[in-house]
Amino acid sequence: MGKPKSTPVKTQKSISSFFTPKSSQKPQNSSPPPASNAPENLYDAQSDQETNETAEITGNSSKRTLEEDANGGNTGATERPSKRAKNVDVEEEDGEGSSLPAANARKAPSSSMLGKSKPSTRTNKYMFSGLSQSVAAEPTIEEELEEESEKARKADLHRKFVKKLGHPDSIKRSIPEDDAALEGDEDMEDEEEAPAPVKTKKKGAKTGKLTPMELQVLDIKRKHMDTLLIVEVGYKFKFFGEDARTAAKVLSIVCIPGKFRFDEQAHLNYFASASIPVHRLPIHAKRLVAAGHKIGIVRQTETAALKKAGDNRNTPFVRKLTNVYTKGTYIDDIEGLDSTDAPSGGAPATGYLLCITETKAKGWGTDEKVEVGILAVQPATGDFIYDNFEDGFMRSEIETRLLHIAPCEFLIVGELTKATEKLVQHLSGSTTNVFGDRIRVERVEKPKTMAAESYSRVAQFYADKLKAHQSSNNAREQELLEKVLRLTEPVTICLSAMITHMTEYGLEHVFDLTKYFQSFSARSHMLLNGNTLTSLEIYTNQTDHTEKGSLFWTLDKTQTRFGQRLLRKWVGRPLLDKQRLEERVAAVEELKDNVNTPKVDKLNATLREVRSDLERSLLRIYYGKCTRPELLTVLQTMQRIANEFAHVKIPSDAGFDSVLLNEAVASLPEIGGVVISFLEKINAQAARKDDKYAFFLEEYETEEIGEHKCGIGAVEQDLEAHRKEAASKLSKKTPVTYVTIAGIEYLIEVPNSDLKKVPASWAKISGTKSNSRFHTPEVIKFLRERDQHKESLSSACDTAFLAFLAEISTHYALIRDTISQLATLDCLLSLAAVASLPGYCKPTFTSTTEISVVGGRHPMVEQLLPSTYIPNDTSLSTDPDNTRALLITGPNMGGKSSYVRQVALISILAQIGSHVPAESARLGLLDGIYTRMGAYDSLFTAQSTFMVELSETASILKSASPRSLVILDELGRGTSTHDGVAIAEAVLDWVVRETKCLCLFITHYQTLASVARGFEKGKELRNVHMRFTAERNGKQVSNANADKDGEDVNEEITFLYEVGEGVAHRSYGLNVARLARVPKAVLDTAASKSRELEAEVKQKKLLGLSKMISNVLENDVDQLEQLIIGMEQL
């Protein structure tokens, strides 16, 4: 007989971790666990009060059966032993013996993981405990007095371990660390030593001596080569082969050496592996998908008790790929649902998956044209954005849509053109891109018959949905089907590809929600292209691409996640509909004026009480992935909101003057009746504890649930009746009393003095010096029946819960509309909070295109500056008698760019519906804002700085309309002065004469000031400059006389940041060089060269003027005007 193995005793009333979700139970009658985790057979003697004894194995004993089950039923194969570094028990590698005493004696998850309080008595009755059927291997140390022999045996084993592990220090890794640290630190995981080589020879050498479980994993991996598999093995999730190396790098966990590929490293008999605890799966899955990996969860699809009762008890546990996730499809992030705080750092994540396809390029060079189709879906909220458009060689249209949508994942159908491919790589290829994180890119082929196949697949998909939902809404669903079938060919191709793609992740149901399809190109919003979003810092700042300092950051005072998402849409798509805009502005004004009134306080209080992301939770309900506590939170939150406004029967009952506010508030109580009907069916206390067995009230439980509960009750009655029969066999008059030790129930304790009365058919489970504990054959049989009922009950509870979620999903549209109205109220209250800031005013809107602002300020800089921001006035209008363009000059760092951004941002704020930072604002509705600011090259399109500058300018000239605002900053600086001036003057003249839009033109070319004289009325273009003061040798120098003696390096420049009439005759570049601490010797040389060049230029101008004078004297009147202009410039 081999040497006994020590199995630690761990008190555990029941193992609820067989079910998902779990509930916690406190241990009872626990024996203390061992103080350390010594290697196999290296154990210390137990205490004198409780010494484990060797289990007696009889022909009728269940111990052999359980041991066979511990090996996954693989009687013909030898399993490798594994030595864990942080567990106190010895478990078989396959981890499939769910009912093993060794497995059940493991350290159970803490109560903080499984629930904050004990389940109800009703639930305890149905909790499955695999321990109850186990025969714990707790052998007694028979040779306790032979200390010398024991020491020699330990020393021999130690030498073997040293030889096996390579060096003595390696064994330190098997010492368990503090369990509290394991619970508290996400990076400390269950680690394993490399398994010892199997000494016995196995059959099937051609399979590389892999275990049946590893062969299962290998088979799944072959079918999903692009997926990182996370495999459930007992109480852990494990990674194998190359997946283990990848996971170890991302998660900072230990990778146990072994073969990384099946077809390589033939000298190794086992795969490399890494493992994580079961309760840490959501955290690590989120980290893996955030790193850009596609992960698959492989779960055991059968449980120990049902497997033992079935015909396949001698085969490994069946494992299947149950879930696949990527960054865009990971909707199981429960942590993110309970917080209203935005993620810190990085760009705001939208969670969109974007599918893109395009036709082959037509034309060549700058005449290249491509037709593009996009479809973006947000699985977490059910929103869709689609578009079909033509784009030029700069791909500015694609860039605009990508920056607006900010996808977290791309699906590319077919091949993209070279320019588009480079754009996608540029925007997503690094961790420092404008989206704030690395973007995952997947590709699918595009055969020549893709269009026809896509129409067929989409039509079939929605036709099947229509058949499956024959109801009163049949007409509405038919209308949605027709809407989908009217989509253009490129969009249909994207839709078909996306349906196929989402089906792999089990999220194809999101395409039922075609009500929320939205076209990006719908001209009901102001167009903000990609350059404008970046230049004006709409979503992120230009310094570190974070949200702080952006326009969205300035306006975001929302209290809910879904309100924050809606506000982001509002910021990127300012309104063009004057009626809707005035309704929104009026609502904000009313909320601002009534900020401390009871009705507004009630709205704020209601939003503050929303602790979860209702919009995402609703989609999880729709997908059938919602947890019981999450469902309870959603239903109770919706009930609380409905009760708060139960008195509102019609919109006028809300008590507001604003139609928008009244309609939003009136929609909130509509959901009350539906929510209450669902809450009446569930047990709130059980739902809060994630208790599946008591979730439904008894009258609403399904027949199957009741049947299995009755079965469990009958078995427990049989166990109670068996007490008398057991007592009679022990010659006792009173019924025996069952005891529970280390989580093993229904033990019969017999004093060692009465062991001769115990029948041989009784299986000894454990014992002490004074007592022994047994299971009778009848108890083993009853417990097996009870466990089968419990596992069937667990499955029935899960099935009933999914049916309950499906029933709630039938009211998806009503609940979604209520949440949307709640988000609208959140956004309006956020804008009202901004309007309450000092110095903000309500804008008024006109039918003409104009911008008339008094005392305007930059909304973001004002909040970031510690000092007061200097306000400025602006007056632009497309009326013939007014100025529609400003030519802005001034010294470097004088505030020119901040001023033009301020004008644009005030226009955007007004059309969002917000108050604006100004004393007064009278604005027309702009259909677009176009900017050309900054200097940068474009390596991904192989374009120089000047090429990018002119390409963007050309795009603006083609796109701008008389209702647009165009901002051009230092156009022409990327080339020589003469060419730059020529291009800048031509563009300025075209914008003012031909396009006739509002324009702000910044330049350092003072000669452009003469363009204003070329207009008949002299008002269309006006020269302004950023005011400043200059002191030279203690004397103030006026702007008019600033350039008489050239620039002096010792001049002190004071920026006034005010807009004044006229032209600034100098840019004071040397002043900026001095502020930048350029060496004084360099500054002196630069000042000298500057004076020389200016003198040379003046000399040339004088020479030219002298020639003109001679021509004028010869009666050449045509040159008289040129003469006058030249003299003014001098």
UniProtKB/Swiss-Prot annotation:
UniProt-annotated stretches for the region Mispair-binding domain: 207-328
Q: Which residues bind ATP?
A: 890-897
Is-annotated flag, keyword ATP-binding?
yes
**Keyword terms of this UniProt record:** ATP-binding, DNA damage, DNA repair, DNA-binding, Nucleotide-binding, Nucleus
Where in the sequence does UniProt note compositional bias of the Basic and acidic residues kind? 80-89
Where is the sequence biased in composition, kind Acidic residues? 140-149, 177-194
Molecular function in Gene Ontology? ATP binding; ATP-dependent DNA damage sensor activity; double-stranded DNA binding; mismatched DNA binding
Q: GO biological process: any one? A: mismatch repair
Q: Where is this region: Disordered?
A: 1-152, 168-207
Q: Provide one Gene Ontology cellular component.
A: nucleus
> Where is composition skewed (Polar residues) in this entry?
8-20, 44-63, 109-135
Q: Which domain of life is it from?
A: Eukaryota
Q: What is its main location?
A: nucleus
Subcellular location as annotated: Nucleus
* Complex and partners: Heterodimer consisting of msh2-msh3 (MutS beta). Forms a ternary complex with MutL alpha (mlh1-pms1).
- Family of this protein: Belongs to the DNA mismatch repair MutS family. MSH3 subfamily.
What is the role of the protein in this entry?
Answer: Component of the post-replicative DNA mismatch repair system (MMR). Heterodimerizes with msh2 to form MutS beta, which binds to DNA mismatches thereby initiating DNA repair. Msh3 provides substrate-binding and substrate specificity to the complex. When bound, the MutS beta heterodimer bends the DNA helix and shields approximately 20 base pairs. Acts mainly to repair insertion-deletion loops (IDLs) from 2 to 13 nucleotides in size, but can also repair base-base and single insertion-deletion mismatches that occur during replication.
**What protein does this entry describe?**
DNA mismatch repair protein msh3
